[in-house]
């Protein structure tokens, strides 16, 4: 008699192994692609990809965008972001760490796992909370895999990513009248700093969800 197939599905946040080589290669869960006119996000309770909202304005995410499994922006992440940005009372945003993945391939849908190498990141403060965006390249990508650090990345690519995150929540009225932005990019950092940010978010995850507070 054949075995019954398993009906359980691995939760994209809690199931996959983040890294097996000290943050040189990362497992990434992709939520949004450049083709999406709807903002999708992982439903943390169920592990299903859900519609968050239609994209309000004309800008689209210029890269694959998602989260790093087994990361959580909590106390350690918030404290470190505040120290590095010289700002007080910065908290973690209580979400998985976000990641942007560069590739020349046309990946047209999310809800997938892929392997990518971190090359740097954006230190972002959103309404007083740490909201860093790790930037990575798809492993074995024919174009972007040559990039080893953020300093190797074309300025035009970084400009598009920064512009998206600075404006995707802003209304035309907000921009026309120059109202203070809730989102602030306070720094751009390279690979080693990105790995530090990932490590702290991984430790925050262990502190939050694992009974034994493991040191990594």
Swiss-Prot record:
Arranged from A to Z, the UniProt key words for this protein are:
Cytoplasm, Hydrolase, Magnesium, Metal-binding
Instruction: Write the Enzyme Commission number(s) for this entry.
Output: 3.6.1.1
Q: Name one GO cellular component term.
A: cytoplasm
One BP term from GO? phosphate-containing compound metabolic process
The organism's place on the tree of life at top rank: Bacteria
Which residues are Mg(2+) 2-binding? Answer: 98
Q: Where does substrate bind?
A: 39, 53, 65, 168
Q: Which cofactor does it need?
A: Mg(2+)
Q: Sorted alphabetically, which CDD domains does this protein's record hold?
A: pyrophosphatase
Similarity annotation:
Belongs to the PPase family.
Q: Which PANTHER family match?
A: INORGANIC PYROPHOSPHATASE
> What is this protein's function per UniProt?
Catalyzes the hydrolysis of inorganic pyrophosphate (PPi) forming two phosphate ions.
Q: What is this protein called?
A: Inorganic pyrophosphatase
Q: Which organism is it from?
A: Chlamydia caviae (strain ATCC VR-813 / DSM 19441 / 03DC25 / GPIC)
């Amino acid at each position: 008699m054949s075995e019954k197939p398993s009906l359980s599905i691995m939760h994209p946040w809690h199931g996959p192994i983040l890294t097996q080589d000290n943050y040189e290669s990362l497992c990434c869960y992709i939520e949004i692609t450049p083709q999406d006119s709807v903002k999708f996000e992982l439903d943390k309770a169920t592990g299903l990809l859900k519609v968050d909202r239609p994209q309000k304005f004309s800008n689209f995410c210029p890269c694959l965008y998602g989260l790093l499994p087994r990361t959580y922006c909590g106390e350690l992440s918030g404290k470190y972001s505040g120290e590095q940005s010289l700002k007080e009372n910065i908290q973690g945003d209580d979400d998985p760490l976000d990641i942007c993945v560069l590739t020349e391939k046309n990946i047209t849908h999310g809800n997938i796992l892929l392997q990518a190498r971190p090359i740097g990141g954006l230190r972002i403060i959103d309404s007083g909370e740490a909201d860093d965006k790790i930037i990575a390249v798809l492993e074995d990508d024919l174009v972007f895999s040559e990039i080893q650090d953020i300093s190797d990345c074309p300025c035009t690519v970084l400009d598009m990513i920064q512009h998206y995150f600075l404006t995707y929540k802003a209304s035309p009225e907000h921009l026309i009248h120059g109202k203070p932005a809730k989102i602030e990019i306070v720094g751009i950092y390279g690979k080693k700093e990105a790995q530090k940010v990932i490590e702290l978010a991984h430790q925050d995850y262990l502190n939050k969800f694992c009974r034994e507070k493991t040191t990594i």
